[in-house]
Amino acid sequence: MPVFHTRTIESILEPVAQQISHLVIMHEEGEVDGKAIPDLTAPVAAVQAAVSNLVRVGKETVQTTEDQILKRDMPPAFIKVENACTKLVQAAQMLQSDPYSVPARDYLIDGSRGILSGTSDLLLTFDEAEVRKIIRVCKGILEYLTVAEVVETMEDLVTYTKNLGPGMTKMAKMIDERQQELTHQEHRVMLVNSMNTVKELLPVLISAMKIFVTTKNSKNQGIEEALKNRNFTVEKMSAEINEIIRVLQLTSWDEDAWASKDTEAMKRALASIDSKLNQAKGWLRDPNASPGDAGEQAIRQILDEAGKVGELCAGKERREILGTCKMLGQMTDQVADLRARGQGASPVAMQKAQQVSQGLDVLTAKVENAARKLEAMTNSKQSIAKKIDAAQNWLADPNGGPEGEEQIRGALAEARKIAELCDDPKERDDILRSLGEIAALTSKLGDLRRQGKGDSPEARALAKQVATALQNLQTKTNRAVANSRPAKAAVHLEGKIEQAQRWIDNPTVDDRGVGQAAIRGLVAEGHRLANVMMGPYRQDLLAKCDRVDQLTAQLADLAARGEGESPQARALASQLQDSLKDLKAQMQEAMTQEVSDVFSDTTTPIKLLAVAATAPPDAPNREEVFDERAANFENHSGRLGATAEKAAAVGTANKSTVEGIQASVKTARELTPQVISAARILLRNPGNQAAYEHFETMKNQWIDNVEKMTGLVDEAIDTKSLLDASEEAIKKDLDKCKVAMANIQPQMLVAGATSIARRANRILLVAKREVENSEDPKFREAVKAASDELSKTISPMVMDAKAVAGNISDPGLQKSFLDSGYRILGAVAKVREAFQPQEPDFPPPPPDLEQLRLTDELAPPKPPLPEGEVPPPRPPPPEEKDEEFPEQKAGEVINQPMMMAARQLHDEARKWSSKGNDIIAAAKRMALLMAEMSRLVRGGSGTKRALIQCAKDIAKASDEVTRLAKEVAKQCTDKRIRTNLLQVCERIPTISTQLKILSTVKATMLGRTNISDEESEQATEMLVHNAQNLMQSVKETVREAEAASIKIRTDAGFTLRWVRKTPWYQ
């Protein structure tokens, strides 16, 4: 099957596919319409010349290369494409003498398919060799990174740095060239991100090595921390380079990304549970412990972390973990309630507490088992990939030693482990059957090589057979691992809501559990937010979560019984929709408040840690102060990460912002202990310049990452909501200051004033970012003026707070401080108003009465009513032709996933009128064409021309959507929205080109009996996946274009009308 993950492959395959499509149409005209096929000598000669040139270049490459795999895989591709070319030439010759020849038509269609398939194989084989060149450079850097462990002198460090630099530069250049060549946008981003991380870590590595060498040679304290810093940086760089190697080998969508994320999430959850378990059990053992204190919070956090693991599991494992979490949560509520009523020492309370304690042990064991199973399957999967890679090199070398057989045996052993962990017996048996076949073939090949017959035709054929069988085995084990995981919901809130809505609308349709998984994900985030809330707010949010859970279970039960379309199900669906809306609103309100509190000040704890680390050696309680500030910094960093994750989960962010937040949270978690280690080295080596520079490097890296995280969190939540929450928080801080002054508590006053100043500065930061993001001069001017006014009010308030703290009973000072506080509040309100421009009054106010002029003249007489027939009423506006989506007819064979993707795009576009909006018109047209393609792709004879033409029409509409979206982006004043729109719409041309190529491939197979079911199904699968990607990209483009149109330039000549067919409030 053709793959086109690079621009070069795509640019070569597209014209070939275009030529082949003409031949396919001629074939169908001859076969179905009985037309004579015209003389094909000239077009076939053109194809033959292009293919011959490609083969010649390929053969020259094989002659000069040292890549054994390339030498092995190129010749079969040459043979395939040359045989296909021969068939085409024979067909042209036969048709010259007989334009109606049936054998000639068969040669024509088989040759066409062979040309496309063979050319693709040839290009892919060559591309794989290019990738191996880059991987060799990457592996060279990986090997050299391990040398860092033996560098113990400054001379060695200088040499190491000099040697590492050129290799890093070469790798960076190759990766940059490769990412520009890739057609998959996600793969490009992954490569760029990993390479950027490696570049950022290089100075950190040199700094860590330098401090290690310094402390080791001077025999100072802190050598253990220096060693940790160095090893962490080496491991982090190695992990990123390994990720680069993995992504370089991807040719289609990324199937492995979830595995490492899930394993990592489970390990982190397990570590968090272990760290909280003693504190939780201590609270349960103590009948006098207060409800709501750190011990109870530890239990809530354990249940939260275990719930995250449960969501990553499937089937019975998932039900058991989540069920245990819910039960323990309810029992903890009961224990807390009894203690709040003073009955903590009662037999009932003591028994409940003991049951919770035992339940926590059971839950921890379940979580450990789940983590162990996923890690075992993931490790086996990764091990199989490495061993098969090594085995392929052995299979390509006729004189290879016995180590290759060992690699194959190792891969088979790992595959057996996956088979044993499979829940599906059919999958397990399929893998085990493949193991037996590969073992027998490998044994036979090994015997031939030991007899010195490794270069014989039989041995070479066997080697090729084993290579193919190993690739098939890898596909089967990958699928088994993927199927063992639950259905994956979208990573962002709007995506989850959309998936949930689709299931609610059609609960009987099999969506592989995605809709229910999305609802579970939303409910899980609701529980997470509730865990940090207090009293009635917490109970209210939990009640909303339980309501959604109950309604989902009831609707799923009705759907399972075949009653998903019944009136009862419709009523339930309506209730569930309303409950989801309520839950979403309350979650976003809670999350915005938490962001306002936690992100009001991100850097003070690390600055205080820096002060403690540089304290003079004779400072009192130097170590104790440092330990306290290190713990505060660690807790603060953890809170930032947890809150950022909530903002990502329930904010208004798109997928790329969510992934950006997740990446920055991961980096913060990794960096925090390294910053503390660097600070401890500085504490134990006062005055050491190398230690100071190293700490500054680590500190700045942490601060840069948190600033990036803060910016992404601000993108993820509504700016006005954040400003509202900050304004309310400042009011509460002012109220606390009033209480402090009334009770003569200067420290409480200072804390309140400090909080006000931090929140005001946070608002300034948000406003500054929005000004930088906008190109609307009026908006920029208004926000900047309001920000400047706010900026001027902060310092006077701080000065007044210091004055009143020094003499808290002075009424005059108290009044000055409160006046300053109210001035800040007023300035904050003006910033908020700048983000919410006043809407014009509707209806407009009446005219000024003073402008009225009365005269003595009489009004003219009223004209008579028209006589005769009453004119007919105005006819209703004509219905838009593209409104109705075609329903599947009884007995009609269609491709269901393709039809569903088309329907989803049509549903999105139908929200808007296509009058005056060419993007909507083109999107609806594409959806209807894709619905037609879902029928053609399953058709028999007589549909080749229609399939090819349909793909061309879809590509034409795609070009129209892309062109219009770029016009909208050009006029949009919001840089973020513009970038999002361009990123989405720029995917469309590549995908639509691929659709044309894949449709041509599929057309060559329609009605043919000499094609295997597996090959035909593979072609359909690729076409379906491409269609789904295209429909999704256009759907996202429609949404982003609508968002961009709100921020369009007022003087823009280009406009699109966005008129909702169904208003949002209905």
UniProtKB/Swiss-Prot annotation:
Q: Which UniProt keywords apply?
A: Acetylation, Actin-binding, Cell adhesion, Cell junction, Cell membrane, Cell projection, Cytoplasm, Cytoskeleton, Lipoprotein, Membrane, Palmitate, Phosphoprotein, Repeat
Its Gene Ontology molecular function terms? actin filament binding; alpha-catenin binding; dystroglycan binding; structural molecule activity; ubiquitin protein ligase binding
Q: Where are the sequence repeats?
A: 259-369, 370-479, 480-589
Any one Gene Ontology cellular component term annotated for this protein: outer dense plaque of desmosome
Q: Where is this region: C-terminal tail?
A: 879-1066
Q: Which residues carry this modification: Phosphoserine?
A: 97, 260, 272, 275, 290, 346, 434, 574, 579, 600, 721, 795, 809
Q: Where is this region: Disordered?
A: 857-887
Tell me what topology the record assigns in the membrane.
Peripheral membrane protein
Q: Where is this region: N-terminal globular head?
A: 1-835
Function summary = Actin filament (F-actin)-binding protein involved in cell-matrix adhesion and cell-cell adhesion. Regulates cell-surface E-cadherin expression and potentiates mechanosensing by the E-cadherin complex. May also play important roles in cell morphology and locomotion.
> Would you tell me the protein name for this molecule?
Vinculin
Question: What lineage is this protein's organism placed in?
Answer: Eukaryota, Metazoa, Chordata, Craniata, Vertebrata
